[in-house]
Amino acid sequence: MKRFLFFTIACLSSSWGMAQIATDTYVEVLYFHGKQRCATCKAIDKHTKEVVNVDLAELVKNGKLRFKEIDISTPEGEKLAEKYRVSWSSLYVNKWENGKEERNDMTRFGFQNARSNTTVFKKELKQKINRLLK
């Protein structure tokens, strides 16, 4: 009887842990780039990192926000670039909920604003991340 009870509790605990992982909601910011980057690409990189690591550091600490910098010239980066159909510098802000990804391509916005209108770029990026977490 003790073995049965232990087995049942172990199974339930295991199932509950899996359910927690499956319902995890977070935002993942992906910045793709090649070996050579223009001034605008560098601005997107710099200001995205500032938003994620400084302005929204608490979300990173809580696991609600993740950042990945992907060099598409590496074998590992090539695989991700193929998955996202990326062939040059790109910025994605994606929501993950219940194991499903909602992609948001912010590349055009980044190129329009990161270098020439930094304040707008950072403000909109923060707003996008916060909206996706609601």
Residue ranges and their predicted role:
Residues 1-23:
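Bacterial Sec-dependent N-terminal signal peptides
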Residues 34-41, 45, 74, 114-122:
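Solvent-exposed, acidic/flexible segments
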Residues 60-76:
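Thiol-based oxidoreductase modules, predominantly thioredoxin-like and allied folds used
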Residues 75-98, 105-107:
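Structural alpha/beta surface segment adjacent to cysteine/selenocysteine redox centers
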